[in-house]
Design a protein with these regions (language model features):
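Hydrophobic structural segments
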Residues: 1-112
Length: 112
């Protein structure tokens, strides 16, 4: 079986107050296109936790203190050839120093 990866799914957690800015930014770069539809994303409310160490400059919270943040997990598909451009824009607008980003390769149904 020869599988040609043409799309990826980008998943990132974002503070709830910033999710629309991130969504608009990645979709304006070309993420979230499915057939004849654009801005196709999914978001799920969640609680993120982290402890910034002494070297961190946290957007939310204090160094060396456990933080609980209302976040949304934002998901969007993206053509693999524009993924780097989308990720660059995501990092530019995301408020965190080190956002948690997953990049999942997608298999086309016809390749199964």
């Amino acid at each position: 079986m020869n599988i040609d990866i043409k799309k990826v799914k980008i998943i990132v957690t974002v503070p709830a107050e910033n999710v629309e800015e991130v969504r608009n930014s990645i979709c304006n770069e070309g993420a979230g296109v499915i057939g004849n539809y654009t801005y196709c994303t999914m978001s799920t409310k969640c609680i993120g936790t982290f402890i910034p160490d002494d070297k961190a400059n946290p957007y939310i919270g204090e160094n060396n203190k456990l933080e609980f943040v209302e976040e949304e997990k934002l998901e969007a598909v993206c053509d693999i050839y524009i993924a780097k451009k989308v990720l660059k824009k995501l990092r530019e607008v995301h408020p965190y120093e080190e956002p948690a980003i997953d990049i999942i390769p997608l298999i086309n149904e016809e390749d199964l």
